[in-house]
Structure formats: structure tokens, C-alpha cells
């Protein structure tokens, strides 16, 4: 399997705008999994208020942000390392660990592989199959840990949407501890679940020093342009990361946005409810289309398998309608038959379904 190319994610709306001549605001982006409610009022106000502070260096300790993370997620500040997006921390982590071999449950988020290869690691895949609903077999995954330095789990997994139960994750983490491996559990989409507290691995941090939890704040709080994330790990790991990263890696506006976002309980509850309702309608609408098989979903995106056309062909057809979808051809263990769609608001989802229906008619986009 060839490693991922230099940039093959969804959400590259500016490149598409340059290619098509459309303004980014004219495009409906279903390729990026961002909260459809958009920026909260609290975040907008916090960023405006913080503008005058950008004449100063940002707080290198990110003290207020760490306090907000601590309150929101019930963890000690000593476990928290803040980052310029979760991706930055992923790369720093791989650079300081210098793994010789990593194990991925594929298909999954491509930056795990890219960060590992950038640090010189060999990458092995544990295949997740459509026949098994893309569910992880924790015992079989644990049996592959010999000689592995870092194992990555995404929960819920991007792009499949499958959830890993905490007990299943602990099976892997415990086996990895015996094998001398770190386990990075990416919980960037977990906040979209109403029962997220039942599935997070945060309660396992005290028992397993080899557990590292990665979390982006940009997806749930709709701030990908600001870049904000954090990592939870044993303080010894955090100290190593702090010495390796840029001391001012989280800018003033991102810190202010994070504090405001994490304290906004009303926005969080509204987001979970809105995404759950819209996702149910979207999955039903997709299932009614000819040649589309959506897989069960629990976060703010849906994986679907196509029959009668391919993802690259459909992507181009949808682009002519001003709609971006995620062609999953470049995911290891997926084929050109797969697409991923974000969950948006009902009127946007209706526009998506109408365009899909038109372009899938007679299987000839």
C-alpha cells in the first residue's frame, strides 16, 4: 500500500474554489466533518474581545485553556498538553517517540500514518472489513502488538463511524502495556455522542501510563481555521512533548475561543441533539437512493458504499452542483466504491440528497 499523498483530506474548500472559480461561500462542503451549527455566539464574542491581546505573545502555559479543559473533561491540568490542532500534537508525539513500527486499524484518519512515516516508522494495517461492519476485534488487534511501538485507535472511527467500547479499548491498552507500546486513542468525534462519558478512555488514564488520548476541538466547535486540540497523557509524556513543541504553539485567539467554547453547555447540548436528528434523516434519505448503502453512524458523518458508479465520478458530478463530498478511494482498505458525507442541517441535507438523486439516476452521473 502506498503512503498517503501530501494532502488528501476533505475540507480543502479553498483549493476547490480556485479550481472552479466559485467563492468558498458558494460551495456546500460535505467533505469536512464540522459541526453544522457553526460558530457559537460565545466563541464569536470571545475572539472579538481577544483581538486587542494579539499585540502580546500568547500564554505559553495556556493556563486558562487548560483550566477550561480540566473542568469540562474532569481531568487534572498536569495531564493536558495543548496544541495547534490535534494534528500538531500527533506529529510531535511521533517525533519524540521515534517509533520503528506502528499499527493502525484501517481504514482510519490518514494523519496517523503520515505522522508515523515522517518519523521514520514502518506502518502495518489491521484491516476493518465491510462484512464485519468495520467493527474492531480487540483481541485480534491486541494479538498484532508484538514489535509495535505505537498503536492508533480512532473512536468513533473516521471514516467508518464505528464506536469502540471502553472495555474493548482497555483490552488493547492492557495488551500494549505488556508489549511496551503506546496506544493513542483519538476521541475527536466522541463529543457528538449523547453518551460520550460512557465511552471515553479518560477513566483509564490513571491505570495505564501507556495511554494517550488525542482530541481535536475544531470539529465539535466549528473552528478548524483557528486550529485547536489537546492531548491527555501521563505527566512524564507531557513533559517530553512540552520540550519538543513550539512554546507559543496555541495562539491567543484560539485560546480565547477554546475557553469560551468549553464553557458553553447550551451550545454543546444543542449540537448533540441537532446532529443526532439530522443524521437519522440523512441516513434514511441515503438508504432510499438507488445504489447507495449507508453504514450505521454515531457521529457527524456517514460512510456509504456505492453501486453503479464510483466515488471519483460522483464527486466530479456533485462538484458541478457546487457540493463537495469525500471520495474515500485513498483510504487503505477502502475502494472507489466508498464516499463519506458530513451531517449538516436539514435544508442542506435535503439539497445534498436531491443532487445525489439527480446524479445517481440511471447510475450515470
Regions found by a protein language model. Give the residues of each.
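N-terminal "arm"/small-domain region of PLP-dependent enzymes with the aminotransferase-like
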Residues: 1-56, 147
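Short acidic capping loops at alpha-helix termini that bridge into adjacent secondary structure
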Residues: 25-26, 76-80, 101, 180, ...
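PLP-dependent aminotransferase class I/II
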Residues: 39-40, 61, 210-288, 293-295
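Phosphate-binding glycine-rich loop
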Residues: 55-101
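Conserved PLP-anchoring active-site segment centered on the Schiff-base-forming lysine
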Residues: 96-115
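Active-site phosphate-binding strand-loop segment of PLP-dependent enzymes
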Residues: 124, 130-193
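PLP-dependent enzyme catalytic core of the Aspartate aminotransferase-like
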Residues: 167, 320-321, 330-365
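Conserved PLP-binding catalytic core of the aspartate aminotransferase-like
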Residues: 276, 289-322, 343
